[in-house]
């Protein structure tokens, strides 16, 4: 388990950028936490770490955003989904094996039925306590 405590959005982004450089293509990262606890902030830093130049925002209404950088970033937001079945209905499983990039899933706790033991789970409690857990 990796523990990281952040005292600011900037620290969260810096941690995420460094973490991104250590991930392999095909990695799925589940971001779990309440509203306003830094999931999108983490995603922004992560995107920066893999060379995404575009502005990264939470795809709450789009559900999925794809970004090109040194590697592809699939950014999924499950906030508006009611169940894992909703995730499957939008073709979410197609983003879980990205050979040329990484998939970040915000609000992953809403799709627990599709969780996999190979995923990395990051629990955001608040900006002052971001806990990364790798299984």
Question: What is each PLM-predicted segment?
Answer:
Residues 68-104:
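Conserved nucleotide-sensing/catalytic segment adjacent to the nucleotide-binding pocket
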Residues 31:
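Hydrophobic anchor at the beta1->P-loop junction of P-loop NTPases
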Residues 36:
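Walker A (P-loop) phosphate-binding loop of P-loop NTPases
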């Amino acid at each position: 388990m990796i523990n990281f405590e952040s005292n600011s959005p900037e620290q969260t982004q810096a941690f995420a950028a460094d973490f991104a450089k250590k991930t392999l293509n095909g990695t799925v990262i589940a971001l779990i936490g309440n509203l306003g606890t830094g999931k999108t902030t983490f995603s922004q830093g992560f995107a920066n770490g893999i060379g995404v130049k575009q502005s990264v925002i939470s795809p709450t209404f789009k559900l999925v955003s794809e970004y090109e950088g040194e590697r592809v970033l699939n950014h999924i937001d499950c906030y508006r989904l009611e169940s894992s079945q909703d995730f499957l209905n939008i073709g979410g499983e197609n983003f879980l094996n990205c050979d040329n990039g990484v998939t970040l899933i915000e609000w992953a706790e809403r799709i627990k039925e599709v969780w996999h033991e190979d995923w990395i789970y990051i629990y955001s409690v608040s900006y002052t306590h971001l806990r990364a857990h790798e299984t």
